[in-house]
């Protein structure tokens, strides 16, 4: 990375620049989150009387015996109903605070949204720890989730992370920087998920099962909060957009990927003497941002629905996973962060940004369709492998939008995007859980088939963006219609 933080002397600059890195906060937070997510699922499963499920799941990766009937179905419905309410609380409570935190971050201090959201993360992890330690009812977790949401939740945290990542990088390098943050998030989530099942089994045979797992989650969340408060520094804004573009041209392949979404860029690249830029003509920024929003929301519907149903799917026949297998399955999901990062580095050398977005959508849609027909554990991992580029669309859309807005509006716009995704995700979670309850005895893969359809449907607005992009490159600029 280039020297984006200025200091009084050359010796002090590298040290100051290291303190502007958001990656340690992202890594610690994601380890805490992956431990928490696995712990939440396993604790809730145990709370709803998982006596029938754990032993059979430990014996094999799939059930070879007769169906376990009503008790398993009742447990699945109880877990599903818990997550319906839980996801509603997690999704709706940030609406009261996340936008305000984004506004404060833009006008007061960039760390406000991150620090307040991390405080909420810590409180929710402490809530799960107390539930395990004191054997409280599962309804306590709704209150812990509400505290997390009132502090901004993931919407405020991730918007703050994206704002700091965008602010501290030049426009040319921003695409790779944001995907690198996602890579760190994926690696941390992979490590946490791999360890989660083993940590959960450290205290077994009584209500304290999961104590070690939840304590580790609280420790990581505490570290992230203290680091963001005491160590993290806000990076100084990178050079002006024009200079950043010039500097970025020296980075082979990866730089020009997202830049063509900016209508002004087509003016800069137009052949001299052919359609010179006209300052009086309006540029269709709002249209493109709206299309990107639409594509992101429809695609996120597919992703959220799949992610919400998958934990229930792997606990039930035909897979019937145990605690360790659940952790491994979650870890497999985090490898998508790694493969998507590598995909951006490779595809950006030969494809436009819209093409990369569509590749990611096809990857996820195909994997979700395969997931609908999974009968064995190895088939599950094959389906997950097909989803290897599933992260590219949302990350690329965020990067593209950052090129179309002013730096002073990063926090606000990213919060609006994240809240839109969160709000639609809440509705999706409720609908998908209800669909799963109705169809799990007839065709358990119904939700995955629906996600596949939505993923391919999301390609349409991105295709329109690609068409408009081709018009810019051909004619130099266009009028807003």
Swiss-Prot record:
Expressed in which tissues: Highly expressed by the epididymal duct epithelium.
One of the protein's GO biological processes: transmembrane transport
Region (Disordered): 263-282
Catalytic activity, as annotated: N-acetyl-beta-D-glucosaminyl-(1->4)-1,6-anhydro-N-acetyl-beta-D-muramoyl-L-alanyl-gamma-D-glutamyl-meso-2,6-diaminopimeloyl-D-alanine(out) + n H(+)(out) = N-acetyl-beta-D-glucosaminyl-(1->4)-1,6-anhydro-N-acetyl-beta-D-muramoyl-L-alanyl-gamma-D-glutamyl-meso-2,6-diaminopimeloyl-D-alanine(in) + n H(+)(in); L-alanyl-gamma-D-glutamyl-meso-2,6-diaminopimelate(out) + n H(+)(out) = L-alanyl-gamma-D-glutamyl-meso-2,6-diaminopimelate(in) + n H(+)(in); N-acetyl-D-muramoyl-L-alanyl-D-isoglutamine(out) + n H(+)(out) = N-acetyl-D-muramoyl-L-alanyl-D-isoglutamine(in) + n H(+)(in); 2',3'-cGAMP(out) + n H(+)(out) = 2',3'-cGAMP(in) + n H(+)(in)
Gene3D superfamilies for this protein: MFS general substrate transporter like domains
Membrane topology (Extracellular): 59-83, 135-143, 201-210, 308-326, 375-376, 434-446
Segments in the Cytoplasmic topological domain: 1-37, 105-113, 165-179, 232-286, 348-353, 398-412, 468-481
Transmembrane segments: 38-58, 84-104, 114-134, 144-164, 180-200, 211-231, 287-307, 327-347, 354-374, 377-397, 413-433, 447-467
Positions of glycan attachment: 61
Glycoprotein as UniProt keyword: yes
Keywords: Cell membrane, Endosome, Glycoprotein, Membrane, Transmembrane, Transmembrane helix, Transport
Subcellular location: Endosome membrane; Cell membrane
GO molecular function: cyclic-GMP-AMP transmembrane transporter activity; transmembrane transporter activity
One Gene Ontology cellular component annotation held by this UniProt entry: endosome membrane
Membrane-related topology note: Multi-pass membrane protein
Post-translational modification: Glycosylated.
Function: Proton-coupled transporter that delivers pathogen-associated or danger-associated molecular patterns to cytosolic pattern recognition receptors as part of the innate immune response to microbes or tissue injury. Has selectivity toward muropeptides that contain the amino acid diaminopimelic acid (DAP-type peptidoglycan muropeptides) including Tri-DAP and tracheal toxin (TCT), common in Gram-negative bacteria and Gram-positive bacilli.
Family: Belongs to the major facilitator superfamily. SLC46A family.
Name under which the protein is recorded: Solute carrier family 46 member 2
């Amino acid at each position: 990375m280039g020297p984006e933080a200025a200091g009084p002397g050359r010796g002090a600059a590298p040290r100051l620049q290291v303190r502007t890195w958001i990656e340690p906060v992202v890594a610690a937070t994601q380890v805490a989150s992956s431990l928490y997510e696995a712990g939440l699922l396993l604790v809730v499963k145990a709370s709803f009387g998982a006596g029938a499920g754990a032993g059979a799941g430990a014996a094999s990766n799939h059930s070879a015996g007769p169906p376990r009937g009503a008790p398993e179905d009742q447990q699945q419905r109880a877990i599903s109903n818990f997550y319906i309410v839980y996801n509603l609380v997690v999704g709706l409570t940030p609406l009261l605070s996340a936008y305000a935190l984004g506004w404060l971050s833009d006008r007061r201090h960039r760390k406000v949204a991150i620090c307040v959201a991390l405080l909420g993360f810590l409180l929710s992890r402490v809530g799960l720890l107390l539930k395990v330690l004191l054997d409280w009812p599962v309804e306590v977790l709704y209150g812990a989730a509400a505290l997390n949401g009132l502090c901004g939740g993931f919407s405020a945290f991730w918007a703050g992370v994206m704002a700091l990542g965008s602010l501290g990088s030049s426009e040319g390098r921003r695409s790779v920087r944001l995907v690198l943050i996602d890579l760190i998030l994926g690696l941390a989530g992979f490590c946490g998920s791999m360890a989660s099942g083993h940590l959960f089994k450290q205290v077994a045979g009584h209500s304290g099962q999961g104590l070690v797992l939840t304590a580790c989650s609280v420790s990581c969340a505490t570290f992230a909060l203290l680091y963001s408060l005491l160590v993290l520094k806000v990076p100084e804004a990178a050079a002006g957009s024009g200079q950043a573009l010039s500097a970025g041209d020296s980075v082979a392949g990866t730089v020009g990927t997202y830049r063509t979404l900016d209508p002004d860029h087509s003016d800069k690249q137009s052949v001299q003497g052919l359609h010179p830029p006209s300052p009086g003509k309006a540029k269709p920024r709002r249209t493109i941002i709206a299309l990107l929003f639409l594509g992101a929301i429809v695609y996120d519907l597919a992703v959220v629905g799949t992610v919400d149903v998958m934990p229930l799917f792997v606990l039930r026949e035909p897979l019937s996973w145990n605690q360790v297998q659940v952790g491994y399955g979650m870890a497999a999901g985090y490898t998508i962060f790694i493969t998507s990062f590598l995909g951006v580095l490779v595809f950006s050398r030969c494809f436009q940004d819209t093409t990369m977005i569509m590749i990611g959508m096809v990857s996820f849609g195909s994997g979700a369709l395969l997931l609908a027909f999974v009968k064995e554990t190895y088939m599950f991992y094959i389906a997950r492998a097909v989803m290897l580029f599933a992260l590219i669309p949302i990350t690329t859309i965020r990067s593209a939008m950052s090129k179309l807005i002013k730096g002073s509006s990063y926090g606000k716009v990213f919060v609006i995007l994240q809240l839109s995704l969160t709000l639609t995700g809440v509705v999706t979670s409720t609908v998908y859980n209800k669909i799963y309850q109705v169809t799990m005895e007839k065709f358990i893969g119904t939700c995955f088939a629906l996600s596949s359809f939505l993923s391919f449907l999301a390609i349409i607005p991105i295709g329109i963006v690609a068409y408009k992009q081709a018009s810019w490159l051909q004619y130099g600029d266009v009028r807003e219609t």
